[in-house]
UniProtKB/Swiss-Prot annotation:
This is Large ribosomal subunit protein uL2cz/uL2cy. The keyword Ribosomal protein applies. Its main location: plastid. It comes from Morus indica. Belongs to the universal ribosomal protein uL2 family. GO terms for biological process: mitochondrial translation. HAMAP family: Ribosomal_uL2_B (MF_01320_B). It is found in: Plastid, Chloroplast. GO terms for cellular component: chloroplast; mitochondrial large ribosomal subunit. SUPFAM superfamilies: Nucleic acid-binding proteins, Translation proteins SH3-like domain. Residues 224-274 are annotated as: Disordered. The keyword DNA-binding does not apply. The lineage of its organism: Eukaryota, Viridiplantae, Streptophyta, Embryophyta, Tracheophyta.
Length: 274
């Protein structure tokens, strides 16, 4: 990612950075408007996702997570910014005339060709089933259910590793450190998702974060009782409980929050590292 550092002319630009090489110029037939209502609240106005609100209007880009244009070569035409995710996207022109957006693989350049299918080369950006990949391949945009499209390792810089194949399942090490089983006939894309250094980019000021729809993060004790169990009281008050709690009232320190007897428990060989 080519980072442009602002010249220090004001306090807000002292540590600000932006990527000047990637711009947004979406195609009209691959975008549509979305109604963002609530901004982190449900129908009753209760906060269900904290620290959300405001932000600039967005148009949703239709991303091809299925990669079902089989055995048809496509050419990367543009690399664009997507306001709905922290990874970049690239526009693909396929040989049959189809045009689609996909996640930008790290290192892919304008003019490169990609393809998806069963017997395609192990090349960055190509999509193929796990059965046709050698062990140790770095992959992203991984299917969990055949034909449903990629659901794992889609964030900026995300990459998983194929470490074993046995029977009808393949063993993957996910970006979180979790090791789990995936059906071997599911597809994935070779390589790592681009925009790796996005978590190291400094926005420089609070207003830039507001444009992204992110509100300030504050402690629970300074909230109202309707928003957090620690809230309320006269002036500076203790939490009023024996132990800290989450905004939904569950124990905050150490208790596992994963649902018991979940269907995927048998597929997880090692829990994710915290």
């Amino acid at each position: 990612m080519a980072i442009h550092l602002y010249k220090t002319s004001t306090p807000s630009t002292r540590k600000g950075a932006v990527d000047r090489q990637v711009k947004s110029n979406p195609r009209n037939n691959l975008i549509y408007g979305q109604h963002r209502c609530g901004k982190g609240r449900n129908a009753r106005g209760i906060i269900t996702a904290g620290h959300r609100g405001g932000g600039h209007k967005r148009l949703y880009r239709k991303i091809d997570f299925r990669r079902n244009e089989k055995d048809i070569y496509g050419k990367i035409v543009t690399i664009e910014y997507d306001p709905n995710r922290n990874a970049y996207i690239c526009l693909i022109h396929y040989g049959g005339g189809e045009k689609r957006y996909i996640l930008h693989p790290r290192g892919a350049l304008i003019g490169d060709t990609i393809v998806s299918g069963t017997e395609v080369p192990i090349k960055m950006g190509n999509a193929l089933p796990l059965t046709d990949m050698p062990l140790g391949t770095a992959i992203h945009n991984i299917e969990i259910t055949l034909g449903k499209g990629g659901q794992l390792a889609r964030a900026a810089g995300a990459v998983a590793k194929l470490i074993a194949k046995e029977g009808k399942s393949a063993t993957l090490k996910l970006p979180s450190g979790e090791v789990r089983l995936i059906p071997k006939n599911c597809s994935a894309t070779v390589g790592q998702v681009g925009n790796v250094g996005v978590n190291q980019k400094s926005l420089g000021r609070a207003g830039s974060k507001c444009w992204l729809g992110k509100r300030p993060v504050v402690r629970g004790v300074v909230m109202n009782p309707v928003d957090h169990p620690h809230g309320g009281g006269e002036g500076r008050a203790p939490i009023g409980r024996k132990k800290p709690a989450t905004p939904w009232g569950y124990p905050a320190l150490g208790r596992r929050s994963r649902k018991r007897n979940k269907y995927s428990d048998n597929l997880i060989l090692r829990r994710r590292s915290k």
